[in-house]
Amino acid sequence: MKAKLLVLLCAFTATYADTICIGYHANNSTDTVDTVLEKNVTVTHSVNLLEDSHNGKLCRLKGTAPLQLGNCSVAGWILGNPECESLFSKESWSYIAETPNPENGTCYPGYFADYEELREQLSSVSSFERFEIFPKESSWPNHTVTKGVTASCSHNGKSSFYKNLLWLTEKNGLYPNLSKSYVNNKEKEVLVLWGVHHPSNIGDQRAIYHTENAYVSVVSSHYSRRFTPEIAKRPKVRDQEGRINYYWTLLEPGDTIIFEANGNLIAPWYAFALSRGFGSGIITSNASMGECDAKCQTPQGAINSSLPFQNVHPVTIGECPKYVRSTKLRMVTGLRNIPSIQSRGLFGAIAGFIEGGWTGMIDGWYGYHHQNEQGSGYAADKKSTQNAIDGITNKVNSVIEKMNTQFTAVGKEFNKLERRMENLNKKVDDGFLDIWTYNAELLVLLENERTLDFHDSNVKNLYEKVKNQLKNNAKEIGNGCFEFYHKCNNECMESVKNGTYDYPKYSEESKLKREKIDGVKLESMGVYQILAIYSTVASSLVLLVSLGAISFWMCSNGSLQCRICI
C-alpha cells in the first residue's frame, strides 16, 4: 500500500515538473501549395506567382495612349478610308487596337498585296510622320485629280475616295504618259502605297484612261514591278464590278522610287516616315478604352502585375509576365500549417512540434513554449527565424527575377494561302507554351518541396540544440518536449533558449531527482512482484480445492469409483 501511494505521489509530482517544448508557428491561413510528393498542402505563408486578373480595358502604356481603330481596319486606316478620318491626325501610339470584324477596310473592293506582312511591319512602329509625297495640286498637271471618286467610298452621303491615294483620270480627253519620282530624304524608312485599277469592261477603260493597253511601273533599289490591268467582268462587291489592287513598299533613306504609267494608276498622295519602337504591336480586341495606365496590355484587358507568370492571354504588349496554361503557381514561404489540438493538462501543457504548430507564437517561425512555477509562455527563436526568412526571401526573389523576363508577344500574320504554315506555327507555339508551363510548374513543385524540408530541418536542429544542452538534466517526453529533473525558473529557461544553459550548475539536483524517481520505480516493482506471486499461489489453491470437491461428489454418487490397492 505504501508503494502505491509513492507511485501516485510521484505521478502527481511529475505533473508539476518544469518543461520546455520546441515547436513552430501556425495560423489560420488556408493557403495551399503543391509539392513533388503532395498536393494541396496547407501552409502558413505563400506567395502567388501567377497573375490571373485583368481590368477589361484598353489602357495607356507608360503614359502613351493606344491607337484604337474603332470600326476601321488597319487597311482602312493606312489607305485613308474616308470613314476613318478621325484617325488621320494620330501620329504616335503605344500599340494599335483593332476590333475582330471592323466595318471600314478597303472601301473599293480589291486585293491588298502582302497585307499580313504590312501589318507585321506596322506592329513594330510606334509613330510616323504623315506627309504629302506627291502634292495633289502640283504633281499631276496633265491629269485630273478631282474626278476619281466612287459611291463605294462615300462620306457624309457623297462619293469620295481614299485620303492617302489619288485616282488619276484623263484630262481634256487625254491621259499622257506620266513619270514621277520621290527621293527619301527623311532619314527614316518611308512607307509608300499605291494601287492599280482593273475596270470591268473596255468601255470604262477607254472613258477613264483613253487607252486600251495601259501599264503601271514602280521601281526602286529594292522593288521593281510592272502591272498590266486585267479588264474583266466580276461579281459585284459593294456595287462595284471593277477592282483596285493595293500595293506597298518600304523606301530606305536616300533611295528613290519612280512611278511610270499611261493609265490605271492609283497614285500615292500621302506617305509615312516610320519610327519603330520596342514594345509596340497590333492586338485584336473588343475591349473599350479606359482612363488607366498599365505596363502590360492583353486583348482581354490590362494587367498591372510584377508577377513572373500570367494565364490571362498569350498575346501581350508591353512589359508582361510570361503566359502559361497553369491555373495555380503558388510558392511556399512559410511552414506546414497544422495547428495543434491544444489539449491542456493541469498546467496548460500543449503539444510540441510533432503533433502540430502553435497559433500562440506569433513573432517567429520557430521557438519555445515553457512552463514552470512562475508561469508559462511562448518565445520565438529570432535568430533561426530571421536566417530562414532571409534565405527563403532571397530564393523567392531569385526565382521571380530569373523567370520574370517581361516582353511583348503578338500574334503572327498569315494570309489565306499560308494556312499550313499558320497551323505549323501554332503547333510550334503550343509546344513552346507546353514547355514553359511544364518548367514553371516543376520549378514551383521542387522549390516548395525544398522549402518545407528546410523548415522541418530547422525545427529538428533547434530541438537538437536544446537536447545537447540539457543532456541528462532533463528527459524527452515526446512531442518535442523536455521535462527537467531540476527546478528551472525564467532565468534558467532563457539560458536554454539563448544557448547559455549551465549544465554543471543543475547536474547535482538533477542526479538526486533521477535517483529518487528510479528508487520509487524499483520499490514499486518489488511490490508488484510479491502481489503477482501471491495471486498465482492463491489461484492454484482454489483450483485444487475445486477439483477435490468435484471428485468427492462423484465418488459419493457412484459416478466415480476409487480403488486403493496395497
UniProtKB/Swiss-Prot annotation:
Superkingdom classification of source: Viruses
InterPro entries: Capsid_hemagglutn, Hemagglutn_HA1_a/b_dom_sf, Hemagglutn_influenz_A, Hemagglutn_influenz_A/B
Protein topology in the membrane: Single-pass type I membrane protein
Residues linked to a lipid group, S-palmitoyl cysteine type: 555, 562, 565
Any one GO CC term of the record: viral envelope
Cystine bridges: 21-481, 59-292, 72-84, 107-153, 296-320, 488-492
Any GO molecular function: host cell surface receptor binding
Record's signal peptide: 1-17
Role: Binds to sialic acid-containing receptors on the cell surface, bringing about the attachment of the virus particle to the cell. This attachment induces virion internalization either through clathrin-dependent endocytosis or through clathrin- and caveolin-independent pathway. Plays a major role in the determination of host range restriction and virulence. Class I viral fusion protein. Responsible for penetration of the virus into the cell cytoplasm by mediating the fusion of the membrane of the endocytosed virus particle with the endosomal membrane.
Recorded family membership: Belongs to the influenza viruses hemagglutinin family.
Name of the protein in its database record: Hemagglutinin
